[in-house]
From Swiss-Prot:
It comes from Pongo abelii (Sumatran orangutan). The keyword Transferase applies. Arginine hydroxylase that mediates hydroxylation of 'Arg-111' of NDUFS7 and is involved in the assembly of mitochondrial NADH:ubiquinone oxidoreductase complex (complex I, MT-ND1) at early stages. May also have methyltransferase activity. This is Arginine-hydroxylase NDUFAF5, mitochondrial. The keyword Transferase applies. One of its GO terms (biological process) is methylation. Keywords: Membrane, Methyltransferase, Mitochondrion, Mitochondrion inner membrane, Oxidoreductase, Transferase, Transit peptide. Its EC number is 1.-.-.-, 2.1.1.-. It is found in: Mitochondrion inner membrane. The gene is NDUFAF5. Interacts with NDUFAF8, leading to stabilize NDUFAF5. Interacts with NDUFS7. Interacts with PYURF (via TRM112 domain); the interaction is direct and stabilizes NDUFAF5 protein. Residues 1-36 form a transit peptide. GO terms for molecular function: monooxygenase activity; S-adenosylmethionine-dependent methyltransferase activity. Belongs to the methyltransferase superfamily.
Amino acid sequence: MLRPAGLWRLCRLSWAARVPAENLGRRDVTSGVSPRGSTSPRTLNIFDRDLKRKQKNWAAQQPEPTKFDYLKEEVGSRIADRVYDIPRNFPLALDLGCGRGYIAQYLNKETIGKFFQADIAENALKNSLETEIPTVSVLADEEFLPFRENTFDLVVSSLSLHWVNDLPRALEQIHYILKPDGVFIGAMFGGDTLYELRCSLQLAETEREGGFSPHISPFTAVNDLGHLLGRAGFNTLTVDTDEIQVNYPGMFELMEDLQGMGESNCSWNRKALLHRDTMLAAAAVYREMYRNEDGSVPATYQIYYMIGWKYHESQARPAERGSATVSFGELGKINNLMPQGNKSQ
């Protein structure tokens, strides 16, 4: 017999020659995709990148890909908002892991002079969404970027970096290709993403099969992001989190949409399949534990947003320790010397 409350704790614990960008014209395509299966010697090889390429290619060539674009379009618009928050223009920008171009559609040519859109999936690039910005499509792996140092004024990435095997190296490469005083703005799924689905599958599989395998890929913890960005060389960091909750008729509809997004699990240690009765049990657990009043079930997508700047001498820096000319002990005296009307009420 399933005991959801008793098992809740179980659920919760669980580089390609460098190409100068300015030599590429509109609609040109270059490739920086790594050899299949290649990874950095120090990489934790968690994800099957060839499988992820196939998943994204399959999703991009479906008859109605826009049916599954809702989440990536929403996060893409929020990345665009953060770009607009910076009062400057960006002559050359890169969207890393662009998919079908979910960020570019929300930006304009007054803000972005030229946009490079890079993705591991060629079908996503071929079926990209319309934008008024001059664009260049680049077939490239996020782990092996084919660009020279100090190339871009802006790099953005939305819901792509959670699939790389070596996130520290990917961030280091992003920093490398940014110009001094360039900025990186990214978004990736957080650790609580799809916790409802994860828990339901674990509970059902434990009950029916005597144990469970990971069916949802692992995510980076928010506490690690600031450290990783700093280690990659970024400064003036901002990291914040948000949650988007989407309601579905049931668990199977959620899983269908994840497949349509190209977000199916690609971990090497994934289980090939689940028995039919285990899937039905998981759907029942999902509905029992998380059902809304209208009968739908929620799915939570936790999003980490990050902003980091490449150092330039013009950037504001904190004053050196001990450079203050007034001590805290003298603040009272200064207050007494101020005109009465200037004192705070």
